[in-house]
Amino acid sequence: IVPEPFYPNYHTFITTAGGVIHPLHTKPEEGYFYADRARIEACITPKTKAIMITNPGNPTGTCLTEEQMKMLLDVAVEHDLYLVADEVYREFTYDGEPLHSFGKFDYGQENLILIDSVSKRFSACGARIGCLISRNRDFMANALKYCQARLSVATLDQIAAAALYSVGPEYFEQVRQEYKRRRDTVVRKLHEIPGVICECPRGAFYLMAALPVDDAEKFQLWLLQEFEDHGDTVMFSAGEPFYATPGKGCNEIRIAYVLKQEDLERAMDLLALGIRKYNETH
């Protein structure tokens, strides 16, 4: 069970391993909220093996409260499921949202698998260093077999990654403040565009928005091939690849607010102008 929209590689990983994704549907106008026990349990069948989530979310920026996290772990324990929690964006929460990890709970650890990485936390994507964490010995024994079939991460990358963990909390506070400013800019500008649906995300550095266009991927190609303003255009990720359900997300986009403030302002102005001109001709 995976709340959709979700990180597209989950689909690749799960299906390659012989699994089947049962998508948990969400809505843009509800901020892609999925932490509803009744809806989650309605997805569970005798074949269900796991619930997989990203918290904070990619591509939605959705954050779980501590109570919502506890509810998900309760469901996993009561139905004897794995709860796979991808926490690579854990430090990136805003608006006073406290930082939580599923590893803090003193029960259900046999059901829990945590995924973490240096790539987002320290902006060190090139290092390709991450980890699986679980107290389930059977699971870890099987994970070790996979690890032993691969060569190790480069030694220098491991040394550098270990050093990154000596970074103090002031680093993350500065990064959070900068991402919050960028998020606020993008959300403010999106809310100025008629017909756009976008709830303010509370974490990570992504957001999803529904646009007043017939097809976001077609719109994206038009922006790249036929649209420009003073030599500039704008690019984003079309929403449909973030869904397992055919036809969903066709008018949605993901925006990563990782540019400088002035570049984000310009990008959102280009998006607004592009939507207006596209709808005049389509």
Predicted segment positions?
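PLP-dependent class I/II
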Residues: 1-282
